[in-house]
Amino acid sequence: MKSFSFLTLSLILAGALHAQATKPAAKAPAKDDPIQLEQVDVTADKENNFSLPLDAVATSGSRLGLTSRELPASVSIVTQEMMQLRGLRTAVEAVESAVGMTGGTNFGSIPNYSTRGFGGNNVTIMRDGIRQNTASQSSRTVDSFILDRIEILKGPDGLMFGEGAIGGAVNYISKSPSPTLRSDLLASYGGWGSYRVGLGVGGPLKGTGFNYRADYAHNYTNGYQDRNSQRYDALALSVGWRANEKLSLTWFGTFLDDWNESYYGSPTIYDAVINTTVAGAVPEVRTFVATTDRMINPRVDPAARRTNYNILDNYAATENVFNRLRTDLRLTPEIELRNEAYVATQLLKWRNEESNTWNPVAKNITRGALTLIYRDDVLLGDRLDLTIKQPIAGHANRLLIGAVFERNDQIRGGAPGNVTLTIPSVTLLNPNVGYGPAAPFKKTSRIGVETHAFHLQDVFDVTSNFRAVLGLRYDHISLQRDTLFNNTTATPTPFSTFKKGYRTTTGRIGGVWILSKTVNAYASLSRASEPVTQLVSLTTTSADFSLQKGQQYEAGLKGSFLQNKLDATFAVFDLEKRDILTSTLDPVTGLRISQQIGAQKSKGAELALALSPGDGWRIELNGAYTDSKFADFNENLGTSVISRTGKRPSNVPEWVANAFVAKRFANGFSVSGGPRYVSDRFGNNNNSVVADGYVTVDASASYTWSRWQVSLRGRNLLDEDYEPVAGTTMRRLADPISAELSLRTSF
């Protein structure tokens, strides 16, 4: 019913607005027919035609209106046109097309990104520059149809987003109100009962001074795995009003509703294990221990490839609502004031059995306990910026002074105690998974996080060929955690309160050398910080630890060549995360203690090329190399401490590469496609579990008639069996080869 209500609401609203906006269209003279040139296939600007839109404003890298070419940092931009051309259905698929990015959807529909040696919560996920929470706490699968573009900034970005973002930031950008009439329609059907519908309309409301945009997307699949159906509904609205030449107001609203049955992965079966920490260890037939062991002959049984071991009544359901009001006031030609007030809410309920591991002795699957998760979050915030464009000593200068206030109130809940399953183990094939035990959601804690931040950014033209780009941000973070119920026991614990405060200063300093009209070189130093664990999980046991620090040196080149037919970016980086927790022995007591003396380092290079040689051809290539390792890290195993120094962090590939080629023919036909390569990754800090590298190939053939385009697309054409995100005792495998038929139009 929710899906129906979303669709009904969007159709009624969009239809009413579009009817109002199109009333005068019938009177338009025939000479206005060239408006057909707005079709994306025909007239998309160069910045939209490439995955390297160097002259597009990169809002994730600066609030001073700098383009990607002008910014001393690496920013990839995936436009809506790119998503449509490549058939990128979700934000995760879109992000993976960017240079050096890997991604996947974890259980419960949680996106997981990795770049430059860092992943998980080290990569912040934003919506219009606003982070609702850490990625694992609030991020959901988002249909790409409702987005204007996605921006991916590499490396620490505390300047823009505050706490977090040591590895990078992924920013979902909403569509703005449309000043011209435009409608978009998308429909597709593919394997396993998958279908997708998108409807968008926008334009001016004549005589009112208002512009609007409304987009609705419905995405459903039964899933390749048994009992893995997923539904995603998204409605995005925006309304803009220009009161006069100086004042404008714009409201953005996004409403997300999803429900899915979770597939946690296929159990990794093995013949025996070897303890890698013991010299000369012999194989043992026992349960695998991820911190010390290596499996002998690990594999997924093909007969169990589609089996879902989760309980029959599992589900993960969320509702997310984002509202943002932006006010732009031009005080003088040189001074502009911008304010953004926002509120974001999340309601999540989660009922799953999350652990299914192989028992080589009993030759069956050992199951975990019932996991119940409840989240009820409200984020309130306001961001105020003052921009001054005023020369200094005859040199152009842009200065921004800003302040941010946020209050994030979060309620967390789970099962009342350790709720065991009535069926503790099942067979590998044809398992009788049964239903989970009846257990209510119990509120366990209430967390409040308040942030006050001040920041400044400046762009100063030192000479006609050199520009200094500077930024500084100060954050004061206050945390209060009220424990309401201890869910590790059925006996309630007394009410307790924990408080913690942090102060941190981050920023970026860089320089841009203008080598020619189309080629820039740059270098920069950027910093960010984050707690040892996400703030929502912070407890008294981690109260004494300070924020972890991230620092990156980067240099690169951005330019257009061959009479602007070739766009290219190249970057080298050296990124370090310091003060990570590591275990040592107290020299006095001999006890194992945790200290912030560890480090994780990565260095590498990234190259991206986009070539438009003419005659309907389009060629794009990108690749990244990353050398990532723990520089000083001892892991506490409970009974011992073992060094992980020199080991590669989990889920970090050395090589990632993409290629995409498109050819448009004069008769309306077009073809496109290309391969993607990701090298081996490790599933644990011990580097004893390997997720094999893989190559996937997607391709499509399309026919365009008038405003309509029909496409037949093949996905994973090599039928590669692979893990998008490396696992250990369970492997969450991607879908095999599939086909999809789609229809889209714009008018």
Language model: regions and residue ranges:
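Gram-negative outer-membrane beta-barrel transporters
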Residues: 464, 574-576, 595-685, 718-721, ...
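Short, acidic, small-residue-rich periplasmic hinge/interaction motif at the N-terminus
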Residues: 21-82, 570
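Membrane-embedded beta-barrel scaffold of Gram-negative outer-membrane proteins
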Residues: 330, 336-342, 346-350, 514, ...
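Extracytoplasmic beta-strand/coil segments of soluble accessory domains associated
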Residues: 53-76, 80, 86, 92-131, ...
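Short acidic/polar hinge/loop motifs at secondary-structure boundaries
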Residues: 103, 114, 130-154, 173-174
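Acidic/polar loop-and-plug regions of large Gram-negative outer-membrane beta-barrel proteins
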Residues: 219, 223, 238-242, 246-328, ...
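Face-selective signature of the C-terminal outer-membrane beta-barrel domain
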Residues: 323-346, 369-484
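Outer-membrane beta-barrel translocator/receptor signature
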Residues: 145-148, 159-235, 243-247, 321, ...
